[in-house]
Amino acid sequence: KTLGDEFYEQLCSMLVFDALIYNEDRHFGNFGLLRNNHTGEIIAPAPIFDNGLSLFNFAMPDDFKNLSAYAKTRSNPYRISYEDVCKEVMGAKQKAQLRRIVDFKFTRHPSLNLPEQRLTAIEKQLGERTRELLSTPVQRSAKRKNEPER
């Protein structure tokens, strides 16, 4: 929080996104900050990167028959449930971001796709997961400018 409200909001959004896509590899070495090359001043959070261990990349074809059950077996490196993380970081901004993707569908490429059954199963699970995360109570509110710390 010492870097400011916008940094904190973006960190919270990253953690909620990780919960949405079941990112199994978010750790302290794969998110960062952008700095001014001349002054070293921190200017912004880095864009989200290193999401390769998500969207059920380890799932076998049989796992897609009941992806909801398989999803419950996935976790982050710290073994803290995605739901518990979201309970701590969910705010109005994250809820608004989730509402924008509730009906997400992958854009199909003419020739470079995962199998259609896999894409459809992931889309369905993401929709269910989005609705589930939207039911997470907002535990914090964004501080208004010039509002004193409590």
Segments (PLM) and residue ranges:
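Anionic ligand-binding catalytic core segments
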Residues: 1-23, 28, 32-150
